[in-house]
């Protein structure tokens, strides 16, 4: 049966313009499509036979839901360009695009799963800010990663890290295929999270203005090889739209960093025992990402990107002794402190920007000594670069006696600073959403 043909304008209360998180098209709210419900309309011309058709309605229920040609109430929305689904939260809240990338085996997927799980635990209780899935279907794989790490039924058993989370693929379930006539385009699926201040937040009265839908894109390291970003597979073009970029750098993969650690004599059990440990150059990934962003953002070669770049130094548990010597402390506490409390007596915390920036300065100093080309590549590309340490699981990994792989008991995972790059980026890019401590020496 042909798709339902309606003429007219759909009116939805919310933002005047909406940005699709899949194809990044910006369009007036009245152009948004609805997804049919009746089985007669199975098979969309752009998405294929397994998807319900999209349409622009003229009839609505008293509750504002569109009505398809068979009289069924519709509940889901879609982009008028790519026809992929758009969560309702993006109709009401502005998007905040963030991109995370890194070399293969850099620990990016572990970091991402650990970060989002910890954000779910702390955002409401610590910062009086909601943090929830804006689209549970799009976030399904990330939720599975979180469960494997932190809600594993085998939590007390020794599990290989390779069995807990699989590497990010270039194609598959994290991509959507859309047909534009004879041209098929593969779009990367974002992870979507809705955030808003809650009662008790210092800016709770500005919840509608400060609220955001975080659109987080995870890029496979292989996507940054030459020829991997083309019209039919625009896998990294969202990076030019991102308000912040996160480059995951694994110091234990860098031979210079390992040589910097007393010729390997201070390597911990993780680095000595992991037979799967790769030694690889990671700066080409950063340089290729920078080149693509310059091209898509139309930046001159001499012009710096004005959006902040965060270099996340992963597997901190393997090299923490180096930074602790520079910082002068081995404090593994989170960088926030109470600043007040709600009417119900719950504490509200503020992010300790001074402490974070102190760790960032010493992290940069360490990288400048061990891997100066990474520092140069980052600071040549972006005007605001921050180096931060993080460990996705903490000090709980052990090499296997037989195969040399790394093992851990999921119950023993104690992440270090995995939320800090995200929280610090929000504080810098979107002031007001994350409460912060008053700066030392600042005047009121």
Positions of the model-derived regions?
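Conserved C-terminal guanine-recognition region of P-loop GTPase G domains, centered on the G4
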Residues: 198, 208-211, 233-350, 359-379
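Hydrophobic anchor at the beta1->P-loop junction of P-loop NTPases
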Residues: 98-100
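Switch II of P-loop NTPase G domains
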Residues: 84-85, 93, 179, 188-245, ...
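Canonical P-loop GTPase G-domain recognition
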Residues: 49-60, 318-428
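Long, basic/Gly/Ser/Thr-rich N-terminal segments
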Residues: 1-92
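A conserved segment at the C-terminal end of the G1
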Residues: 111-121
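Conserved lysine of the Walker
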Residues: 108
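Flexible phosphate/Mg2+-sensing switch loops adjacent to catalytic phosphate-binding sites
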Residues: 90-91, 119-168, 435-439
């Amino acid at each position: 049966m042909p798709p339902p043909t309606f003429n007219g304008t759909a009116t939805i209360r919310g933002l005047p313009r909406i940005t699709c998180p899949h194809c990044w098209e910006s369009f007036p709210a009245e152009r948004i499509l609805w997804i049919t419900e009746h089985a007669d309309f199975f098979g969309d011309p752009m998405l294929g036979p397994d998807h319900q058709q999209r349409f622009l309605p003229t009839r609505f229920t008293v509750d504002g839901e569109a009505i398809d040609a068979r009289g069924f109430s519709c509940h889901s929305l879609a982009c008028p360009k790519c026809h992929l689904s758009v969560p309702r939260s993006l109709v009401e809240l502005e998007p905040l695009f963030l991109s995370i990338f890194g070399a293969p085996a850099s620990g990016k997927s572990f970091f991402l799963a650990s970060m989002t799980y910890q954000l779910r635990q702390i955002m409401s209780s610590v910062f009086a800010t909601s943090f929830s899935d804006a689209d549970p279907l799009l976030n399904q794989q990330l939720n599975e990663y979180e469960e494997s790490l932190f809600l594993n039924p085998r939590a007390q058993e020794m599990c290989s890290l390779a069995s807990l989370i699989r590497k990010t693929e270039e194609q598959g379930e994290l991509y959507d295929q859309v047909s534009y006539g004879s041209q098929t385009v593969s779009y990367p699926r974002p992870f979507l999270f809705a955030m808003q201040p809650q009662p008790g937040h210092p800016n709770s009265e500005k919840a509608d203005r400060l609220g955001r839908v975080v659109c987080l894109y995870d890029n496979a390291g292989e996507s940054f090889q030459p020829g991997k970003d083309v019209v039919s597979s625009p896998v990294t073009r969202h990076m030019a739209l991102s308000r912040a970029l996160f480059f995951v750098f694994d110091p234990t993969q860098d031979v210079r960093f390992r040589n910097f650690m007393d010729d390997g004599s201070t390597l911990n059990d993780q680095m000595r025992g992991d037979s799967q440990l790769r030694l690889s150059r990671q700066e080409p990934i950063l340089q290729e990402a920078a080149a693509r962003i310059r091209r898509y953002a139309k930046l001159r070669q001499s012009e710096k990107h004005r959006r902040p770049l965060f270099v996340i130094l992963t597997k901190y548990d393997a090299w923490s002794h180096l930074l602790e010597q520079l910082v002068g402390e081995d404090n593994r506490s989170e960088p926030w402190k109470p600043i007040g409390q709600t009417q119900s007596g719950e504490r509200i915390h503020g992010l300790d920007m001074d402490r974070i920036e102190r760790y960032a300065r010493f992290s940069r100093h360490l990288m400048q000594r061990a891997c100066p080309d990474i520092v140069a590549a980052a600071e040549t590309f972006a005007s605001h670069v921050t180096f931060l340490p993080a460990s996705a699981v903490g000090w709980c990994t052990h090499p296997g006696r037989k195969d040399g792989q790394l093992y851990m008991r999921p119950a023993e995972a104690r992440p270090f600073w995995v939320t800090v790059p995200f929280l610090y980026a929000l504080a810098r890019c979107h002031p007001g959403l994350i409460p912060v401590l008053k700066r030392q020496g600042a005047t009121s």
